[in-house]
Design a protein with these regions (language model features):
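C-terminal, helix-dominated tail/subdomain
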Residues: 162-173, 181
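Acidic/histidine-enriched segments that form metal/cofactor-coordinating
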Residues: 121, 137-155
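Short beta-alpha connecting loops at secondary-structure transitions
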Residues: 102-104, 124-127, 173-178
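Structural motif
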Residues: 49-55, 155
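Non-catalytic beta-strand/loop surface segments
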Residues: 5-51, 62-114, 135, 139, ...
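A common structural junction motif
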Residues: 3-11, 120-131
Length: 214
C-alpha cells in the first residue's frame, strides 16, 4: 500500500564469473612497518565455494594449519621453535575464485626467514605426499564441530539458510552440506592439495620489522 506507486525493479542477472587458474609463478611482496614481530603470509587461488574442490582444499588447509595439532603449529612452534604462531584457513567466495591463506609469525627480535622456509617445507610435503587418513578424520571432526555449533544458534542458522537461498536458490542445502564434506576421501583431499596448494602457486607477503630509530 505504501509503496504501490513505485515501479517494480527488475535487476539484471549478474553473469557468472570465470574462475582464475592457480598462479603459475610465485608472487612476492615485502612490507616494512612497526609490527610486533616479523611475519609471512601465503595465499592461493582456490575453487568457488560449495564445490568438492573447495571443500577438499578447506580440509587440506585444516590439516596444514588448523589449530595446535596441525602440521605447521606442531613443526614450527613446538618442534623447531622458529615461530610463535602458525595457521592456515580457506575463505569461501561464490564469485569465481575463493582463496586460501597460511601465516607464520617469527620469534621476537628475529626475521621470519627460518620460519618461512620451514613452513614452505610443510606446504610442499602436504602437496606432494598428501594428508594421512588420521589427519583428514581430525579435520572433518573439527569442521563438523564448527558447523554444528553454528547451526545450534538461531541467528547463525538463519544466516546459513539465507546464504544458501541467496547464493544457490537452495535453502535445504544447509541440511546436506555437512554430508558433502564428510563424504570426501583422503585421496580427494590429496588431489586438491596437489592441484591448488603447491608452494610454486603461492603469493607471499613478508612483513618485516622496521628498525627502531631510538
Amino acid at each position: 500500500k505504501a509503496f504501490g506507486h513505485l515501479p517494480s525493479w527488475n535487476p539484471k542477472t549478474r553473469p557468472p564469473v570465470a574462475p582464475l587458474a592457480p598462479l603459475d609463478t610465485v608472487v612476492t611482496r615485502q612490507v616494512s612497518g612497526r609490527v610486533p614481530v616479523a611475519a609471512t603470509y601465503f595465499g592461493w587461488r582456490l575453487p568457488v565455494r560449495d564445490t568438492w574442490g573447495f571443500d577438499a582444499c578447506d580440509l587440506a588447509l585444516s590439516v596444514l594449519g588448523g589449530g595446535q595439532t596441525s602440521r605447521l603449529y606442531r613443526e614450527l612452534v613446538r618442534n623447531q621453535q622458529v615461530a610463535t604462531a602458525a595457521g592456515a584457513s580457506a575463505v569461501p567466495l561464490v564469485g569465481g575464485t575463493s582463496f586460501g591463506i597460511a601465516q607464520v609469525r617469527a620469534l621476537p627480535g628475529q626475521d621470519a626467514a627460518e620460519a618461512t622456509e620451514a613452513a614452505l617445507a610443510e606446504i610442499d610435503r602436504l602437496a606432494t605426499d598428501g594428508p594421512t587418513d588420521a589427519e583428514v578424520a581430525r579435520a572433518k571432526a573439527q569442521h563438523a564441530r564448527e558447523w554444528l555449533t553454528e547451526l545450534a544458534r538461531f541467528d547463525s542458522r538463519a544466516d546459513l539458510i539465507s546464504t544458501y537461498a541467496t547464493l544457490h536458490d537452495d535453502p535445504e542445502r544447509v541440511n546436506r552440506k555437512l554430508d558433502e564434506v564428510m563424504s570426501l576421501t583422503t585421496d580427494r583431499v590429496a588431489e586438491a592439495a596437489s592441484a591448488f596448494l603447491r608452494p610454486d602457486q603461492r603469493a607471499q607477503l613478508d612483513y618485516q620489522q622496521e628498525a627502531d630509530d631510538a
